[in-house]
């Protein structure tokens, strides 16, 4: 959920996570099982399709297509393997992310870092914390790049799936105008601010990621 924190900032509170179980005996294809459960979870928690961020890289693109057809085309596709955006690195660093980060996934992982450092991200699962702290990165070249997922999995024996899910939540917030900042926020100047100000402290429409 998203709302006003006691530190004067608007932040993200991670309240729950769910691992979708696949029924091997079902005649329904795996991706359709996942899509069905994702939609059910979103509807149970009042998450609108336009507030659902999904990793559209690789097989994720097929899942996006299914959800777009069976639920709504307004779901938010995120190409983790794509190019970094032209958004500023932060309110204090006006350089384009595409000038600093080698790819989108690096941009998103460092965006989470910004939100955590500025005390705007709370309730992170212990497993996700370990994943964020375990992934290596290289900032000695012209552009910063994080370790490839396949390399991290080979090195640690685990894929950073919990951490990737959190990056999608933060990306959803950023798409709505949310940003990490060292300063207290003074007014509703973005769609993100307005959404929170229009509600009683906590914004009851929630966001999700896959």
Locations of regions flagged by a protein language model:
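Mg2+-dependent endonuclease catalytic cores in nucleic-acid-processing enzymes, primarily RNase H-like
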Residues: 2-143, 191-210
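Acidic two-metal-ion nuclease catalytic site recognized across multiple nuclease folds
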Residues: 135-149, 153-210
């Amino acid at each position: 959920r998203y709302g006003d924190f006691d530190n004067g900032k608007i932040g993200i509170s991670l309240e729950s996570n769910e691992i979708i179980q696949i029924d091997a005996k079902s005649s329904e294809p795996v991706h359709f099982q996942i899509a069905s459960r994702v939609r059910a979870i979103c509807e149970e928690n009042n998450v609108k399709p336009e507030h659902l961020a999904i990793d559209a890289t690789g097989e994720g693109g097929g899942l996006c297509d299914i959800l777009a057809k069976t639920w709504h085309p307004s779901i938010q596709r995120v190409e983790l393997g794509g190019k970094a955006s032209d958004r500023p690195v932060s309110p204090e660093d006006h350089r384009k992310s595409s000038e600093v980060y080698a790819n989108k996934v690096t941009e998103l992982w460092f965006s989470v870092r910004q939100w955590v450092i500025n005390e705007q991200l709370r309730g992170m699962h212990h497993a996700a914390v370990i994943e964020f702290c375990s992934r290596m990165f290289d900032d000695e070249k012209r552009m910063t790049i994080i370790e490839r997922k396949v390399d991290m999995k080979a090195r640690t024996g685990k894929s950073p799936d919990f951490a990737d899910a959190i990056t999608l939540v933060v990306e959803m917030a950023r798409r709505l105008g949310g940003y990490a900042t060292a300063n207290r926020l003074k007014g509703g100047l973005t769609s993100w601010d307005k959404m929170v100000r229009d509600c009683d402290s906590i914004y009851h429409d929630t966001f999700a990621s896959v």
